[in-house]
Swiss-Prot record:
It comes from the Bacteria. ATP binds at K299. It comes from Bartonella henselae (strain ATCC 49882 / DSM 28221 / CCUG 30454 / Houston 1). This is Cysteine--tRNA ligase. The gene is cysS. GO terms for cellular component: cytosol. Belongs to the class-I aminoacyl-tRNA synthetase family.
Length: 503
């Protein structure tokens, strides 16, 4: 079995990845809160963990990897946005309208970014029973308490490892100083956090745990503990009915650096306290932060960019015959390519220039594949082992893309295509369709005239009249026509393909 090494946030070092059970490798990633269009910061973990998902499937087999990415559809941000967007509706109706709209948009965005769908996408509102049961387990074990119709996690109740703050590598004093925590009067200690809260009249609410007489809703942190339990533990012998702590650990938990504290710290506290485990997951992976043009992305700085705005932007020319879907898919793959050029743990600086450069380079790759499609059809597309080696070393996508560039420079279309396909950058129909509108920009030159000039150039080359041949090539280039000389696969004779220059 291939050796995989990843940086583990839990231990702050690279480690060999050894799955608990190689026939069911389990990955959980924190997904979106569906109250607004996803922004490009949200796109980064979606793309990063899609690459990890693809690698795990390659190594262990498609049917042996379970990837769960949750959807948070109950949250105070959702309530506030729903009331603002749909003031004419009752709040619960407004919430349903908002969450369905933003969830559907998120699905469309991730598809345009070239991502595979996760194995499972649990929604918080479908797992309220598991949340209540988990909260009641924490109450029974003395790790939670009730106060004014709330249930709170007691941080001081943790006596064994992992102690609270060990994941974030912070002491309680450091966390108190750096955290913006609610110091409500019903808390025993300021770092205690909400597992369940009462709902005001008109707010969404469900039957509360532990006999609390009013309707309520879960806190954010308990949602992920419950959903990961429901999808990655309970189906495989773990969960609340299992007394063996070793059965209540899964393989990989992922998310952004911003989630380390408090969200992931609190998830670990809840899950480990409920199940008596030393770890919630064996490997924790976090992608780095994203900036826009060297600055923190913020609505106040007017540099807040949604995935949707990228997909709908006109950062490069298209001719008028493209469908909206094709435009958006090209923009999505360009954005994906741009992000993969930075290692997932490094900060990523998103710039318009870099997006255009990525789009231009990706276009050239497609041009090679289109020119060599006959040759590609003769050979099986087997992923080059050097690409898998690069990804096996902590998802080193920059190194892997450097290898793809070498394939391009050598004209190795077969290896380039298989690599692009593995990275989610290849749409086969764009290569196979000789008249794909993406590669058919308008020109003022008549096609018959172009073909005549190409024939004349080939004659000059045959006669070794290089200067005259180059003159024809240069004049066509000035009109936006790019020539590519190839050998006819049947006769071995030189022939020339032409495309309208894309950039």
């Amino acid at each position: 079995m291939r050796e995989l090494r990843f940086y583990n946030t839990l231990t702050r070092k690279k480690e060999n990845f050894i799955p608990i059970d190689a026939t069911r490798v389990r990955l959980y990633v924190c997904g979106p809160t569906v109250y607004d269009y996803a922004h490009i910061g949200n796109a980064r973990p979606v793309i990063v963990f899609d690459i990890l998902f693809r690698l795990l499937r390659h190594v262990y087999g498609n049917e042996h990897v379970i990837y769960a990415r949750n959807i948070t559809d109950v949250d105070d941000k959702i309530n506030a946005r729903a009331a603002y967007e749909y003031p004419e509706l009752a709040l619960n109706d407004a919430i349903r309208q908002l969450t369905q709209l933003t969830y559907t948009q998120f699905q469309q965005d991730t598809m345009a970014l070239g991502c595979l769908p996760p194995t499972i996408e649990p929604r918080a509102t479908d797992h309220l029973e598991e949340m209540r049961s988990l909260i009641e387990r924490l109450l029974e074990k003395g790790h939670a308490y009730k106060a004014e119709n709330h249930v709170l996690f007691s941080v001081s109740s943790i006596r064994n490892d992992p102690h609270y703050g060990s994941f974030a590598k912070r002491s309680l004093d450091e966390m108190r100083a750096g955290a913006r925590v609610d110091v409500a009067s019903y808390k025993r200690e300021e770092m205690d956090f909400v597992l369940w809260k009462p709902s005001a009249e008109g707010e969404p609410g469900w039957t509360s745990p532990a006999g609390i007489p009013v309707l309520g809703r879960p806190g954010w942190h308990i949602e992920c503990s419950a959903m990961s339990m429901a999808k990655l533990l309970a189906p495989y012998g773990g969960g609340l009915t299992c007394d063996d702590p070793t059965e209540n650990v899964f393989d990989i938990h992922g998310g952004g650096l911003d989630l380390i504290f408090p969200h992931h710290e609190n998830e670990i506290a809840q899950s480990c306290s409920a199940f008596g485990t030393e770890r919630m997951a064996n490997l924790w992976m976090h992608n780095g932060f994203l900036q826009v043009e060297g600055k923190k992305m913020s609505k106040s700085l007017s540099n807040f960019i949604t995935i949707r705005s990228i997909l709908e932007s006109d950062f490069f020319e298209f001719n008028g015959v493209l469908t909206n879907e094709m435009k958006q898919n090209w923009a999505g793959l360009s954005a994906r390519f741009s992000m993969l050029q930075t290692h997932y743990r490094e900060p990523l600086n998103w710039t318009a220039q870099r997006l255009m450069q990525s789009s231009s380079e990706l276009y050239r790759w497609y041009e090679l594949l289109r020119c060599e499609k006959t040759e590609m059809e003769k050979k099986n597309e087997v992923i080059d082992d050097s690409l898998i080696n690069a990804l096996s070393d902590d998802l080193n996508t920059p190194k892997a893309l450097t290898l793809l560039r070498k394939f391009y420079k050598r004209g190795n279309a077969v290896s380039l295509a298989s690599g692009m396909n593995f990275f989610g950058l290849l749409r086969q129909e764009w290569v196979r369709d000789g008249k794909c509108p993406l590669f058919m920009r308008k020109t003022s030159l008549d096609e018959k005239f172009i073909d005549q000039r190409i024939a004349e150039r080939l004659r000059l080359i045959h006669n070794k009249e290089w200067t005259a041949a180059d003159t024809i090539r240069d004049k066509l280039a000035a009109e936006g026509i790019v020539l590519k000389d190839i050998k006819d696969p049947q006769t071995g004779e030189r022939t020339t393909m032409w495309e309208i220059k894309r950039f």
